[in-house]
Amino acid sequence: FILEAPGGLISIKAEVKNKITKSVEIENLSSFVDLLDAKLKTESFGEIIVSTVFGGDTFIICNARDFNLTIEPKNAKKFVEISKEIIKIANHEFGFSHPTIPSLDYISFCQFIEPVQVNSSQQKEGWNTVCIRPGKLDRSPCGTGTSARLALMKEKNEIDVNEVFISRSIIGSTFETKIKEQFISNGKKMIKPLIKGSAFITGKQELYVSKNDPFPEGYRLNDTWPDF
């Protein structure tokens, strides 16, 4: 079936056994690298090498080792604090260029990664954490973040089409991923990411619309978030 996500429409395939969903695989939006291995000068950490990538949203991807950090829960606060500086400087120095969405000229998230390794099942895997302003990080491997990382890996010849990559989060949860295809669109090398994972029901919510509600379809305001 088709799901409407913030970045667009994505294809969903569920694996069901005995009326229980075992896993769900999504075919995410086309993902691509905007800047590869660019130099970014920071006040706190000097010059670092980063890449800017689209995976359904915009990311700046950094190597956690450049900050003498490993991706584990005890370093969560440090990653969040560092990401604020990185995103602010990167948006000032780089911004973002999307071939078909000119308004998407900014970087939304900072993703820290560790080098790709080969696990005991002879599959490539890698740790990551995605920081979300003003002070959060994704406890999952992040679907859009993983899509961005796959695009970066393909650009660096670290992965082949249809090769499995296990994306591992800061708490150790995983997505099984691979690249369905690579192609050229609007002058950009792009990939189609496939991401498989599972989730668990933790609650149920019911929403109502009153016939007397003056705003039955909701309302819209401009951005009220402060700059960071």
What residue spans do the PLM features occupy?
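Active-site proximal loop and beta-alpha junction motif in alpha/beta enzyme cores
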Residues: 1-228
